[in-house]
C-alpha cells in the first residue's frame, strides 16, 4: 500500500530529542524507499551497532526490511503476510514515546528489531528498546491527585435505577413481545439466564444426557450481554480463541482475533442449536420470584408472563452486564431531545447497523455521549465519522492500549490439534495471572501485562520471590506501561490539549483496560470535541442539552455510555428474590456478605446452583472460562444425583452442609489480600466499588481462590472427578 509518514519529537531531554530526530530521519528515508514498492506495507528498520538487521528468513513481522545505512535497497520478504497469518498474530512490541506520529490516511512506519506494533488504524509504531526515566514519587502524587478529585461519598448511589420514568431505557429494541399462554409445567433443570453461563451449563448437561432443561431468558434470544449490546463497534477485548466457548464442539472458526458483537451473538445461537437448547427455552420472559417448596421438593418459578413453572433443579447465571444504569445528573429527566443507552442502541434514529454500516442518520445531528469507558471507546469512532458534531463528555479517560486485530487464516486453523481450546484456555489463564508457560499462544494485551511483571522479577536473579517483590515488579512494570500508553496518546492525537486530557493517570488495572486502534484517531475528526470535566462530571442536563464546565451544549441526541449495575445487590440486578428452606431469603443469608461453597452451592437452598466468579476462580479477564468449569461441575452433580435416585429408588436433594460452606469461606478469606484496585493510585470505578470501602462484606463478595484461577480450575476438576463431592449431602 502507499506509505505516508510523519515523525516528530515528543521528549524534551536533549538525548531524547537527538534520538527522536535520528529515528525520524531513518524512518522517513525508509518510507520513501518503500513508496516505490507496490507490495510493501510495513517496513522494518534496524540500526547497526544496536541490533543486527534481520534477514528475510529470521523476521516475519514486516513486508520489507531496510538498514539505516542502506535504506535505498529494500529487500522484500516473499511470504511475510503468509507467515503472519500462520502464527495468527502480529509480533508484540512496545510503543516508543520518542517517535511522534501524526495519524494520516494510510501509512506504516519503521520498526526496530524488536518487531512492530499496530498503534492505530493503518498505523504501526516503533520501539527503540530504550528506557524512559520515570519520577515515581511524582507519579504517585499525580495518581492520588487524580483519584481525590473524583472521589464521591455516594458511590454506586450516584447512578439512577432504570425504573419508573426511566424504564423505557431497558425496553427490548430487537423483538416485539408476543402473547403466549402461561406455563405451569415441570422440568428437571431450569436455568435462569440465556448468556454464556446458561448456554455452557446447558451444553454440559446435554453432554451428560440430561436434556429436560429449560433456559429462561428476558431477552428475545440467547446471547446474554451480547444480545443487548449491539452498538456500533461492539467487540470483545479478549481473544476469540479463548473467549468464545465450545469452539471445538460446535466446529466454529472465529473470523478475527477479536470478534465483533454480531459474530458473538451468532455463536451464542450456534451453541443453542447445536445442543438443542432452543427446544424448551422461553424468551422475553423475566423471573419475578424463585421459591423452594419443601413439601414438593421443587422450585417454583414465577415470571412476568404469568408462568408458575416447577423445576427440580435450578441454576442461576444472570450476570452483571445486562441491567443498564444511568448517571444521576441533575435534570436528566428534563431532556427533550432523543436519548438512549448504548446497550439499547437505536438504529432507527442513527441509521447504520451492528455490522458497522455508516450511521447516516446522524449526518445533520449534534450528538452528545456521556462516558468514556469500554463501550464508549468502541462506539465513538463510528459516531465521529458520521455525526455533524460529536461532543464526548469525559470524567475519567480510559487507558487505550493497542488491539492489533486481524483476520484468522483458515489454513492455519485447520492445523490445530484436538483439545487445542482447552490448551489455549489454560495457557492464557496461566500467563495472564502471573504464571509461567513455554509459549504465549494468545499474545495480547492481557498476557503482556503479566509478561512485563515476570520480566521485572526475572531481571533480578537471586532475588527472593515474595509478595513484596511481586508488588514492586508490578508497580515498576505498570509505571512503564502507563507511560507508554500516555505517550501513545501524544503520538496519535493532533491537538495537544485534547491529548493531555485523554491521558489516564492511574494504574492500568484500576479500571477496565481498553484495547483499540481507532479510538484516539477519532479525536482528529474536525467535528469531534472532547469535553473533559477534569473529574467533576457534568453539572446538569436541561431540555435542550448538557451543562459542563460552565458552558451549555445544545444537542439533538444524547447517548448514555454509563455502563451496568455491577456492584448492586443480586436481587436488584436479577430482578427477583430467591427464597429457600424455611422462608429464608438469599439476600438475608448474604446480608453480611456472600456465603457459598465454590461460589455454586448455598446452605439452606437445596438443588440450587449459582454460576458466579466470586468465591471460585474469580477470573475477570476471561469470564467464560469460569462458566466452563462451573457448568461442568453443575452437570456432574446433577448427573450424580440422578444416579443416586436410581440406586436408592427415590429422589434426593443436593445441598452443601453449613460446616462445608463456612470452612470454604474461611479458607478463602484467610488467603484474601488487598486488591490493587483499592490502592490510593486508583481512580473510582466499578472495579473498586466507585472508590468506596466495602469492609468485610465487600471482601466476601469479591474474593476468589487464594492460589489463583489456574489452581482453582485444577482443584475443582479433581473435586468433581473424584465422585465424592465432598461438602455436599445427597439426602433422600
Residue spans for each PLM region:
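N-terminal FAD-binding dinucleotide-binding subdomain shared by FAD-dependent oxidases/monooxygenases
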Residues: 129-189, 194, 206-333, 337-339, ...
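Intrinsically disordered, low-complexity segments enriched in small polar residues
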Residues: 12, 17, 22-24, 29, ...
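Hydrophobic helix segments
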Residues: 14-20, 42-43, 51-53, 64, ...
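Intrinsic low-complexity, disordered N-terminal segments enriched in polar/charged/small residues
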Residues: 6-9, 30, 34-37, 42-45, ...
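N-terminal Rossmann-fold NAD(P) dinucleotide-binding loop
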Residues: 198-199, 376
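Acidic/histidine-rich helix-loop elements
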Residues: 352-354
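Gly/Ala-rich phosphate-binding loop of Rossmann-like dinucleotide-binding domains
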Residues: 202, 206-207, 380, 384
Amino acid at each position: 500500500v502507499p506509505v505516508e509518514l510523519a515523525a516528530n519529537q515528543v521528549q524534551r531531554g536533549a538525548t531524547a530529542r537527538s534520538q527522536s530526530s535520528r529515528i525520524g530521519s531513518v524512518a522517513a528515508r525508509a518510507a520513501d524507499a518503500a513508496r516505490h514498492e507496490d507490495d510493501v506495507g510495513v517496513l522494518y528498520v534496524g540500526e547497526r551497532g544496536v541490533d543486527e538487521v534481520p534477514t528475510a528468513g529470521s523476521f516475519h513481522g514486516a513486508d520489507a526490511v531496510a538498514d539505516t545505512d542502506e535504506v535505498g535497497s529494500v529487500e522484500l520478504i516473499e511470504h511475510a503476510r503468509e507467515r503472519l497469518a500462520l502464527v495468527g498474530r502480529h509480533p508484540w512490541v512496545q510503543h516508543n514515546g520518542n517517535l511522534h506520529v501524526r495519524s494520516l490516511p494510510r501509512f506504516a512506519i519503521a520498526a526496530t528489531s524488536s518487531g512492530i506494533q499496530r498503534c492505530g488504524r493503518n498505523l504501526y509504531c516503533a520501539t527503540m528498546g530504550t528506557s524512559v526515566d520515570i519520577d515515581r514519587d511524582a507519579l504517585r502524587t499525580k495518581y492520588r491527585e487524580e483519584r481525590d478529585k473524583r472521589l464521591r461519598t455516594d458511590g454506586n448511589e450516584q447512578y439512577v435505577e432504570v425504573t419508573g420514568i426511566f424504564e423505557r431505557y431497558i425496553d427490548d429494541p430487537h423483538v416485539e413481545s408476543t402473547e403466549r399462554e402461561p406455563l405451569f409445567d415441570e422440568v428437571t433443570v431450569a436455568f435462569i439466564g440465556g448468556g454464556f453461563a446458561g448456554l455452557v451449563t446447558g451444553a454440559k448437561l446435554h453432554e451428560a444426557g440430561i436434556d429436560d432443561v429449560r433456559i429462561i431468558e428476558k431477552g428475545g434470544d440467547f446471547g446474554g450481554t451480547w444480545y443487548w449490546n449491539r452498538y456500533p463497534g461492539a467487540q470483545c477485548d479478549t481473544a476469540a480463541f479463548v473467549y468464545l466457548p465450545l469452539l471445538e464442539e460446535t466446529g466454529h472458526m472465529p473470523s478475527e482475533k477479536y470478534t465483533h458483537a454480531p459474530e458473538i451473538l451468532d455463536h451464542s445461537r450456534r451453541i443453542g442449536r447445536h445442543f438443542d437448547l432452543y427446544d424448551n427455552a422461553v424468551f422475553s420472559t423475566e423471573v419475578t420470584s424463585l421459591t423452594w417448596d419443601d413439601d414438593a421438593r421443587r422450585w417454583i418459578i414465577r415470571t412476568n408472563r404469568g408462568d408458575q413453572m416447577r423445576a427440580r433443579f435450578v441454576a442461576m447465571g444472570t450476570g452483571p452486564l445486562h441491567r443498564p444504569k444511568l448517571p444521576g445528573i441533575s435534570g436528566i429527566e428534563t431532556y427533550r431531545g432523543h436519548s438512549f443507552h448504548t446497550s439499547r442502541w437505536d438504529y432507527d434514529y442513527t441509521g447504520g447497523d451492528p455490522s458497522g454500516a455508516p450511521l447516516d442518520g446522524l449526518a445533520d445531528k449534534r450528538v452528545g455521549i456521556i462516558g468514556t469507558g469500554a463501550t464508549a471507546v468502541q462506539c465513538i469512532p463510528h459516531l465521529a465519522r458520521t455525526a455533524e458534531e460529536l461532543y464526548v463528555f469525559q470524567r475519567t479517560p480510559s487507558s487505550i492500549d493497542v488491539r492489533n486485530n486481524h483476520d484468522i487464516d483458515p489454513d492455519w486453523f485447520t492445523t490445530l490439534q484436538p483439545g487445542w481450546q482447552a490448551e489455549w484456555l489454560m495457557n492464557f489463564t496461566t500467563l495472564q495471572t502471573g504464571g509461567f508457560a513455554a509459549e504465549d499462544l494468545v499474545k495480547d494485551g492481557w498476557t503482556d501485562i503479566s509478561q512485563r511483571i515476570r520480566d521485572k522479577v526475572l531481571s533480578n536473579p537471586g532475588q527472593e520471590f515474595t509478595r513484596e517483590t511481586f508488588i514492586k515488579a508490578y508497580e515498576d512494570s505498570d509505571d512503564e506501561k502507563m507511560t507508554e500508553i500516555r505517550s501513545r496518546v501524544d503520538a496519535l492525537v493532533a491537538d495537544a490539549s485534547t491529548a493531555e486530557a485523554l491521558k489516564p493517570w492511574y494504574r492500568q488495572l484500576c479500571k477496565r483496560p481498553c484495547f483499540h486502534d481507532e479510538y484516539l484517531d477519532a479525536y482528529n475528526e474536525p467535528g469531534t470535541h472532547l469535553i473533559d470535566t477534569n473529574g467533576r462530571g457534568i453539572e446538569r442536563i436541561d431540555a435542550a442539552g448538557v451543562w459542563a464546565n460552565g458552558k451549555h451544549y445544545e444537542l439533538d441526541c444524547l447517548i448514555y455510555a454509563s455502563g451496568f449495575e455491577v456492584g448492586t445487590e443480586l436481587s436488584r440486578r436479577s430482578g427477583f428474590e430467591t427464597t429457600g428452606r424455611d422462608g429464608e431469603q438469599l439476600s438475608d443469608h448474604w446480608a453480611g456478605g456472600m456465603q457459598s461453597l465454590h461460589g455454586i452451592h448455598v446452605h439452606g437452598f437445596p438443588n440450587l446452583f449459582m454460576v458466579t466468579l466470586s468465591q471460585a476462580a474469580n477470573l475477570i479477564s476471561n469470564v467464560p472460562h469460569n462458566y466452563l468449569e462451573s457448568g461442568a461441575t453443575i452437570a456432574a452433580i446433577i448427573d450424580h444425583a440422578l444416579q443416586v435416585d436410581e440406586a436408592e429408588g427415590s429422589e434426593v436433594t443436593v445441598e452443601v452442609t453449613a460446616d462445608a460452606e463456612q470452612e470454604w469461606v474461611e479458607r478463602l478469606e484467610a488467603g484474601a489480600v488487598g486488591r490493587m484496585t483499592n490502592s490510593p493510585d486508583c481512580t473510582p470505578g466499578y472495579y473498586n466499588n466507585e472508590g468506596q470501602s466495602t469492609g468485610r462484606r465487600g471482601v466476601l463478595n469479591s474474593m476468589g481462590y487464594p492460589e489463583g484461577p489456574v489452581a482453582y480450575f485444577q482443584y475443582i476438576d479433581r473435586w468433581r472427578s473424584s465422585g465424592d463431592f465432598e461438602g455436599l449431602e445427597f439426602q433422600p
